[in-house]
A protein has these predicted regions:
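Ligand/cofactor pocket segment of small-molecule handling proteins
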Residues: 70
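Short active-site oxyanion
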Residues: 62-67
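A short, Trp-centered hydrophobic/proline-enriched beta-strand micro-motif
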Residues: 32-47, 86-90
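Short, structured beta-strand-loop surface elements
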Residues: 79-142
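Short, charge-patterned binding micro-sites
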Residues: 57-60, 92-94
């Protein structure tokens, strides 16, 4: 029954971990990494154990927060009430792109915000629409992120491995960067 709208703003670090202060560049990188990803996995903590579930995403303008529609009577809401630390993982295997973000979730029942983010496609999860008494949002201000973005062509990857073996140098497997807000 979970679901929907998200997006993030972050500061980007380079491969060696130094911080780049260009906020717009960071926004564009996250947009690029998440473009075309329909589902992510939202992970909560349940009695010391990790519990994940798929969530559907839609893109819209963002300011550093992930937003998801959900119902206030779900296990994840109970888990967040006890420990609001979460992780959201995105994956696009065809492009060898992976993104992991973490933050602290907040339950938001602000009707104006719900209406602002609402999309008719959400009726698939919430048949009562905006009149659903359990409808709420999860707001996740992103604190940290890490991504892996490798060349998408298997031939390019294979060439890089062969070149590394031939030259004795480490293969370039693409970018792996940590992002700290």
């Amino acid at each position: 029954m979970p679901l929907a709208d998200y997006f993030v703003t972050v500061q980007k670090t380079n491969t060696r971990g130094r911080m780049a202060n260009n906020r717009q560049e960071s926004i564009e990188k996250i947009k690029e990494l998440t473009e075309g990803i329909d589902f992510c996995m939202l992970t909560t903590i349940d009695g010391g154990h990790l519990r994940s579930r798929p969530m559907s995403t839609q893109q819209f303008e963002f300011d550093g927060d992930l937003w998801f529609f959900t119902s206030d009577n779900t296990h994840k809401i109970d888990e967040i009430a006890k420990d609001n630390r979460i992780n959201v993982a995105y994956s696009k295997p065809d492009d060898n792109t992976y993104l992991s973000v973490s933050g602290r979730a907040e339950v938001v029942k602000d009707k104006a915000k719900i209406e602002e983010l609402w999309s008719p496609v959400l009726k698939a999860w919430f048949p009562e629409g905006l009149d659903d008494p359990h409808l709420c949002l999860l707001k996740i201000p992103v604190e940290q992120a890490e991504y892996w973005d490798a060349p998408s062509s298997k031939i390019v990857q294979l060439f890089g491995m062969v070149k590394a073996i031939a030259t004795g140098q480490e293969a370039d497997y693409g970018e792996n960067k940590k992002i700290q807000l």
